[in-house]
Amino acid sequence: MKSIVKIYLFLFLFSCKNGFDNTYDGSQVIEVKNQIDSNIVKIINPYKINLDKEMNKIISYTTSDLEKGKPEGKLGNFICDLSLIKAEGKADICVFNNGGLRDIISKGNITISDIFQVMPFENELVIIELDKKEYYTLLKYITDRGGEPFSGTEIIKENDTILSDFNNYKKIRVLTSDYLANGGDNMDFFIGKNQNKLGIKLRDAIIEYCEQKDTLKINLDNRLVFKNE
């Protein structure tokens, strides 16, 4: 998968034979002409053909559109659930953010390109251990935002009370991305905590899971419920 990413980035930089970039220097617009030599085009074309073939490879099928949503969405449920499976019991729950999911997966065949569209970042899966107070801050973060992708528990918010399966645990193991683990999207409760890296990119985990499943039937399951609101 690393080789695919490298080729993808290389071809992105040299994807057009002719192009014009307008550069603004503060006083005038400067037109810069970029023209790729035909010899270079001949060199990269075979790579592009192979890359297109790989990116358009069908790896699974979904019976419905997978989209983001609040309080939950099929796309978030799908990615959190498969990531928790990938952790093989090392984590109690999984948490991501809607902002990190960049596209939908439409009903029908799923290609590798579709997964790159959803997850274009090189985010790695990590596990962080939170104490009870920090965990409650995480629950409040999710509910205050009207819902963010998570799995491994049900969350019920009723008035000022937030309940989940792990409220009484002294330590809760949270699976997330290294970006969020470093405080991304205001997840400050993760900052400074030890990160147990699983050694796998989130995008690769999604692709591997899809390759193992002929058909995906993803449902909404009321994993986040707001009562009396």
Give residue ranges: language-model regions.
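Sec-dependent signal peptide recognition
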Residues: 2-10
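A conserved active-site cap/scaffold subdomain adjacent to cofactor or substrate pockets
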Residues: 68, 73-74
